[in-house]
């Protein structure tokens, strides 16, 4: 019964999303729906605007949906930027989704399934190395779930090297905190 209820809510949200997409398209916005066979799970908004003789981009990245009802249930992070490298990456992601061409080379963003996993592990390892040199090193990460063995191994090693690690995991988390000799 709960599955039916949640499926029903999902259908309502899908219909609302379609309505919003159609309304945005009717006023000239380009709405990108994603790639068939690839789950698109991004909360990104990119505005490109002409300012004088130049085009300027403004981007919004979020861990949460743009939904008033669910916003009351979750704690999400939001990032608003006009940084040229970040907004260029966002533009590349949208172009990839719209054209289904090869994934773009990104400078600041990471895109699954193409390079997110590898680059996350590299970044965690870099923080661990900094901690082992006595530098102030910290990882703060928010995610829906933490079940990947490679990421967990990298986090454990970084913590053992002295990095301070704060994880905000909404769902399944297979990494137990404060295990003596492992994650203490």
Language model features with spans:
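Generic long, charged, amphipathic alpha-helical segments
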Residues: 178-181
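Phosphate/diphosphate-binding loops
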Residues: 11-77
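Single conserved hydrophobic/aromatic residue that forms the stacking wall/gate
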Residues: 2-13
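Catalytic-core regions built around general acid/base machinery
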Residues: 1, 19-27, 150-161
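Long hydrophobic segments that form regular secondary structure
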Residues: 77-175
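A generic structural motif
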Residues: 6-7, 31-38, 165-175
